[in-house]
Amino acid sequence: MKFFVLFAILIAIVHASCASVPKVVYDGPIYELRQIEEENIEPDTELMDSNEPLLPLRHRRVTCDVLSWQSKWLSINHSACAIRCLAQRRKGGSCRNGVCICRK
């Protein structure tokens, strides 16, 4: 019974860490917005460069910071990162400075 509970918790953790990874990048049309009249803009504000693409926010530290704990019976320090990398079809990985680094 203890093994089943630990296995269920591990499956829930793997599912939660894989759910935060975007699976598909949007390739549809991107429509331009109209230009704002520059005379209404305050001189102290900086405009964002329109040539830089907006990248999605990635939370890479969850598997290494939150899941990096060990007890007397169980330690999942680098194994959570390795499972996350295997789910991304990579060859495993490890935690470095709180960030999960996957092997190629």
UniProtKB/Swiss-Prot annotation:
Origin superkingdom: Eukaryota
Entry-linked SUPFAM superfamilies: Scorpion toxin-like
Cysteine disulfide partners in this protein: C64-C95, C81-C100, C85-C102
Single biological process term from Gene Ontology: humoral immune response
Keyword field: Antibiotic, Antimicrobial, Defensin, Disulfide bond, Immunity, Innate immunity, Secreted, Signal
Compartment(s): Secreted
Tissues where the protein occurs: Low expression in head and thorax.
GO cellular component annotations of the record: extracellular space
CDD domains tied to this protein: DEFL_defensin-like (cd21806)
Signal sequence, start to end: 1-19
InterPro entries linked to this entry: Defensin_invertebrate/fungal, Scorpion_toxin-like, Scorpion_toxin-like_sf
Similarity section: Belongs to the invertebrate defensin family. Type 1 subfamily.
Function comment: Antibacterial peptide mostly active against Gram-positive bacteria.
Official protein name in the record: Defensin-2
